[in-house]
Amino acid sequence: MSPKTVFSTDTHREPIPPQPHPSGARPPQLPRELIPRHVAIVMDGNGRWAKQRGLPRTEGHKAGESSLFDVIEGALELGVPYLSAYAFSTENWKRSPDEVRFLMGFNRDVIRRRRDELHARGVRVRWAGRPGRLWKSVIKELTEAEELTKHNTKLTLQFCVNYGGRAEIADAAAALARDVAAGRLSPNRVTEATLARYLYHPDIPDVDLFIRSSGEQRLSNFLLWQSSYAEFVFLDTLWPDFDRRHFWQACEIYARRDRRYGGAEPNPVGPPQSAAGAQGQD
């Protein structure tokens, strides 16, 4: 591991510009209206990457860290405002105890090690997921990163740890039901937009582009509500081999899609408000 770079935590300084890719590759020149506002990524293929090299699965997870942070640089270069990364799902508890322990410590250490770097780049960190079962040290690092970066506006990175799409919808429904039971909300006034306000981060807009690496073609319970009108791009590249050039490739594919939202003609405005839920800037 290379020595840690020390970044200033001065919130009044201009963010450090993204670092160019070593290959010299530049982001595609897309019209602003064709740049996805919110990109969700399932970072898949770490285990297979390690197996191909005769390495333990944990080495694949370690190698995937640099891929995520190169993609973050690419999102900053392209001007994508929101990026969601699936770091640990509610189903990942089914893995071996050794791998779960590694992933808990690894997620904690990545946030701790990279927090100042993200802050210096103008990235705002948001955590989405259930606190139950998570190590307290993981929660501590995530909440401290959220506090440090809360005023940043270049990119919002939603770090999904102990997250499940069904769990989020169930938690939202339970919170809504409590408000109905307490008389704060009439059941006759509940709409899709009402439920959307109870999601973990209702201010983060719905997913425009959903990317999955490794060639697998499934959602794996990730941002189910928010991805109802997303465009899906599945790339064969294993996650540790993935970088911003693959991210840009997916964004170019997205830009060529006609988004109809159930209508007969392409609709640049977006889905009906009742389906989209509560969307808005931070």
UniProtKB/Swiss-Prot annotation:
Region (Disordered): 1-30, 262-282
Function text: Catalyzes the synthesis of Z,E-mixed prenyl diphosphates by a condensation of isopentenyl diphosphate to an allylic diphosphate. It shows a large substrate specificity accepting dimethylallyl diphosphate (DMAPP), GPP, E,Efarnesyl diphosphate (FPP), E,E,E-geranylgeranyl diphosphate (GGPP), neryl diphosphate (Z-GPP), and (2Z,6E)-farnesyl diphosphate (Z,E-FPP) as allylic substrates. The enzyme exhibits the highest activity when Z,E-FPP is employed as an allylic substrate.
Cysteine pairs bridged by disulfides in the record: none
Cofactors that this protein relies on: Mg(2+)
Keyword line: Magnesium, Metal-binding, Transferase
Family note: Belongs to the UPP synthase family.
Gene3D superfamilies (alphabetical): Decaprenyl diphosphate synthase-like (3.40.1180.10)
Residues the record marks as active site: 44, 92
The keyword rRNA-binding is assigned to this record: no
One protein family per Pfam: Prenyltransf
CDD domains in the cross-refs: Cis_IPPS
GO molecular function per UniProt: ditrans,polycis-undecaprenyl-diphosphate synthase [(2E,6E)-farnesyl-diphosphate specific] activity; magnesium ion binding; manganese ion binding; prenyltransferase activity; Z-farnesyl diphosphate synthase activity
Residues binding Mg(2+): 44, 231
Entry note: cofactor: Binds 2 magnesium ions per subunit.
Any GO BP: polyprenol biosynthetic process
Protein's name in the database: Trans,polycis-polyprenyl diphosphate synthase ((2Z,6E)-farnesyl diphosphate specific)
Matches recorded under PANTHER family: DEHYDRODOLICHYL DIPHOSPHATE SYNTHASE 2 (PTHR10291:SF0), DEHYDRODOLICHYL DIPHOSPHATE SYNTHASE FAMILY MEMBER (PTHR10291)
Subunit structure: Homodimer.
Entry EC number(s): 2.5.1.88
Source species taxonomy: Bacteria, Bacillati, Actinomycetota, Actinomycetes, Streptosporangiales
Catalytic activity: (2Z,6E)-farnesyl diphosphate + 10 isopentenyl diphosphate = di-trans,deca-cis-tridecaprenyl diphosphate + 10 diphosphate; (2Z,6E)-farnesyl diphosphate + 11 isopentenyl diphosphate = di-trans,undeca-cis-tetradecaprenyl diphosphate + 11 diphosphate; (2Z,6E)-farnesyl diphosphate + 9 isopentenyl diphosphate = di-trans,nona-cis-dodecaprenyl diphosphate + 9 diphosphate
